């Protein structure tokens, strides 16, 4: 169902003379065009009826509204829905019809009032809320701005500073805080919500409660000079934090116009900006990510078979290192009882200590109470053998990347675990078929690849072999959802989706450095592009041991298209291992602050002499644009291989995997979306040119060559891919 035929409102007039309008658009009563137009007609009817004294707006099934139906943007871009004139909804309907009405309205808020939902509530003359309701304007994280008057009403209700905090961080507040801020007029139990709202509306009519038009309020606004200072500071901070995104600054402009020139001018500016931001590339990228993230759990041939997830009552984890302890933390935080197995008491104590430290950091930050900490820790039990595995529903192996060790573990697990138990490996690079070679029940072997730190990073790669049952995938998708991860189901290959796509990223950077490029300029250019850090800073962070082990797997499996640099092995010989030893590509002080190391030059020169690479003046003086293209186009090339081989069913899954696993900037939409925004023809021509000049590493794969020569979208579905899912 698209936004043209989605949702409705229902109006009921009681004997007390209050018309209750209910928003109905499951699951969160989003404000589709249909809902908004229905609301308009209900309002017009209520205003024209003599038996209606006041109006209450509420949402069906315990939720007020989750905001504007974002699919409406997509429908407008496709031309399926005519875009309303700028300000039609925010000014003509919400301000001039609803807020300026001669009959008062009260919002009865339960569950959530987010985005357009909160904006609608703020236009009412009072707001009554249930205690658990969440109130916020999260639009900026979706690439748009509050477009239903939120830029004008929120500062007038809660003050400019708090409004900026809520809008710029996209973080909601609970009803009690909303009440203390002045956003909510009263907090009542859910059962009394509509009754209280009706009474409040009649009290406004009887002048026992104030009739407040929030857009006209000025008592919470600071003096003009102070407001300008606050906004100037907010703009500087925003530019520093998100230099590649225009929409937050455009949002601040709308707020400023309203404060300087009055609310009407502010609403007009907001309407103008709202219609402009939907055309920005960053907005298109963020909206693509929003929908793609929700689509990763839909796997053709798996989730469309009516399979019901089995209940996972207990999980065992083998290995209490950084990864194993992180996975254990994620599970117990979501109320899963966990057994953590180690080889000796010392390692077990250390593993449990890591889990404890992960939770204690939450207590220190105030996001977890001491009581909750103790209750959560009680879900974790330690073990030195497999005896306690006899009643577990899932085991996740998280030991070092050693094939024979993993094979032995999986063979042992089969002897102790029940028949239904899922046998999962957290390997990041090793072929799952090899890991399960000595195991008879291949249908329950699956990859559960978390990213470090596992209790924080949002991605879970679910890796399916040719034998893994659909039921196991459905079970793991359910676990992923419950532990608040975004699961992406991929096929089995070296490196799976994320590590495989991105192995050329670091190798391309190493190649450029050996040819004369400055590593620090490369890191700067890539950080400026939007990555959390550049490839050299990343190598230091993960440590050279991990970097070498990972690179070795790819060099062994894809020798024809890898670049083997000796820079890291040479540094490792000199006891440099990255940030942990305070020496890597950078030098680190006591606070782990990085600074360039003049000694790096000697390792680069030595590596260059070993590889036989000659200094190339052209590559030594690359522009930022060239650096981005030469490091990321090989990633696009490998992503095309992954897609063509059926390792991923949808290009959008690769977009989400890259964003959540490697920190690819979300506002660029993901690696495949970004590639399509540049054009397959251009990417193909550049890679082809570099492969002729610098070798096989840059050679476009057949999939990219075919699509690039015709200018076809790289993300278009693969019609006859032999899917590995």
UniProtKB/Swiss-Prot annotation:
Chief location of this protein within or outside the cell: other
Residue positions of the active site: 119, 139
Keyword terms of this UniProt record: Fatty acid metabolism, Glyoxysome, Isomerase, Lipid metabolism, Lyase, Multifunctional enzyme, NAD, Oxidoreductase, Peroxisome
Tissue and organ expression note: Highly expressed in senescing leaves and at lower levels in flowers and siliques.
Changes seen on gene knockout: Accumulation of long-chain acyl-CoA substrates and increased size of peroxisomes.
Listed InterPro entries: 3-OHacyl-CoA_DH_CS (IPR006180), 3-OHacyl-CoA_DH_NAD-bd (IPR006176), 3HC_DH_C (IPR006108), 6-PGluconate_DH-like_C_sf (IPR008927), ClpP/crotonase-like_dom_sf (IPR029045), Enoyl-CoA_hyd/isom_CS (IPR018376), Enoyl-CoA_hydra/iso (IPR001753), NAD(P)-bd_dom_sf (IPR036291)
Gene Ontology, cellular component aspect: cytosol; glyoxysome; nucleolus; peroxisome; plant-type cell wall; plasmodesma
Pathway info: Lipid metabolism; fatty acid beta-oxidation
Superkingdom assignment: Eukaryota
Domains: entry comment: The epimerase and isomerase activities are contained in the N-terminal region while the dehydrogenase activity is in the C-terminal region.
Family designation: In the N-terminal section; belongs to the enoyl-CoA hydratase/isomerase family. In the central section; belongs to the 3-hydroxyacyl-CoA dehydrogenase family.
Protein name, entry field: Peroxisomal fatty acid beta-oxidation multifunctional protein MFP2
Naturally occurring in which organism (per UniProt): Arabidopsis thaliana
Lineage of source species: Eukaryota, Viridiplantae, Streptophyta, Embryophyta, Tracheophyta
Underlying gene: MFP2
């Amino acid at each position: 169902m698209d936004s043209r035929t989605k949702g409705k409102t229902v109006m009921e007039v009681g004997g007390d003379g209050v018309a209750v309008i209910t928003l109905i658009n499951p699951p969160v009563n989003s404000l589709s065009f249909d809902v908004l137009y229905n609301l308009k007609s209900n309002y017009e009817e209520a205003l024209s009826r003599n038996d209606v004294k006041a109006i209450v707006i509420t949402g069906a099934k315990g939720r007020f509204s989750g905001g504007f139906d974002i699919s409406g943007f997509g429908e407008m871009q496709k031309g399926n829905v005519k875009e309303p004139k700028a300000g039609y909804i925010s000014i003509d309907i919400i301000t001039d019809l609803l807020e300026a009405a001669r009959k008062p309205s009260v919002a009865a808020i339960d569950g959530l009032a987010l985005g357009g939902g909160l904006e609608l509530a703020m236009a009412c003359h009072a707001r009554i809320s249930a205690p658990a309701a969440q109130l916020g304007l999260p639009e900026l994280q979706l690439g748009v701005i509050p477009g239903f008057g939120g830029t004008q009403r929120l500062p007038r209700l809660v003050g400019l500073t708090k409004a900026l905090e809520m809008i710029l961080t996209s973080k909601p507040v609970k009803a009690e805080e909303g009440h203390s801020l002045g956003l909510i007029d009263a907090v009542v139990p859910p059962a009394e919500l509509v009754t209280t709202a009706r009474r409040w509306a009649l009290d406004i009519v009887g002048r026992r409660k104030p009739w407040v038009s929030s857009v006209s309020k000025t008592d919470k606004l600071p003096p003009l000079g102070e407001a300008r200072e606050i906004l100037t500071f907010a703009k500087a901070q925003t530019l520093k934090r998100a230099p590649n995104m225009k929409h937050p600054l455009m949002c601040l402009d709308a707020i400023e116009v309203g404060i300087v020139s009055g609310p009407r001018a502010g609403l007009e500016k907001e309407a103008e900006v709202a219609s402009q931001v939907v055309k920005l590339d960053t907005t298109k990228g963020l909206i693509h990510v929003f929908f793609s993230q929700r689509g990763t759990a839909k796997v053709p041939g798996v989730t469309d078979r009516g399979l019901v997830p089995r209940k996972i009552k207990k999980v065992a984890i083998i290995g209490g290192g950084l990864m194993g302890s992180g996975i254990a933390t994620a599970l117990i935080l979501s109320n899963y009882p966990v057994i953590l197995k180690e080889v000796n008491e010392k390692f077990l104590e250390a593993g449990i200590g890591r889990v404890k430290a992960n939770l204690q950091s939450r207590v220190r930050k105030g996001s977890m109470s001491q009581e909750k900490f103790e209750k959560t820790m009680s879900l974790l039990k330690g073990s030195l053998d497999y005896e306690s595995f006899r009643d577990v529903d899932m085991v996740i192996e998280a030991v070092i990347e050693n094939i024979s060790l993993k094979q032995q573990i999986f063979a042992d697990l089969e002897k102790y675990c029940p028949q239904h138990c899922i046998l999962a490996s957290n390997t990041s690079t090793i072929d799952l078929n090899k890991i399960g070679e000595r195991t008879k029940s291949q249908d329950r072997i699956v990859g559960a690849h978390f990213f470090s730190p596992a209790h924080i990073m949002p991605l879970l790669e679910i890796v399916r072999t040719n034998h893994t049952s659909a039921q196991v995938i459905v079970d793991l998708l359910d676990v992923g959802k419950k532990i608040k991860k975004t699961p992406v189901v991929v096929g089995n290959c070296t490196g799976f989706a994320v590590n495989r796509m991105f192995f050329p990223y670091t190798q391309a950077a190493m190649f450029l450095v050996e040819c004369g490029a400055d590593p620090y300029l490369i890191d700067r250019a890539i950080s400026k592009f939007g990555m959390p850090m550049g490839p050299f800073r990343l190598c230091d962070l993960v440590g050279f041991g991990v970097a070498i082990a990972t690179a070795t797997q790819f060099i062994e499996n894809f020798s024809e298209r890898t670049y083997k640099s000796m820079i890291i092995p040479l540094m490792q010989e000199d006891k440099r291992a990255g940030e942990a030893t305070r020496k890597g590509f950078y030098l680190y002080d006591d606070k782990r602050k990085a600074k360039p190391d003049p000694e790096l030059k000697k390792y680069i020169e030595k590596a260059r002499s070993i590889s036989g690479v000659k200094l190339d003046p052209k590559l030594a003086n690359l522009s930022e644009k060239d650096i981005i293209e030469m490091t990321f186009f090989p990633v696009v090339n490998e992503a095309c291989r992954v897609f063509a081989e059926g390792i991923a069913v949808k290009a959008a899954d690769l977009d989400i995997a890259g964003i959540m696993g490697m920190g690819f900037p979300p506002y660029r939409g993901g690696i495949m979306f970004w590639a399509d925004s540049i054009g397959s023809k251009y990417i193909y021509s550049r890679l082809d040119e570099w492969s002729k000049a610098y070798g096989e590493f840059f050679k476009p794969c057949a999939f990219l060559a075919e699509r690039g020569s015709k200018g076809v979208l790289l993300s278009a579905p693969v019609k006859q891919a032999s899917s590995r899912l």
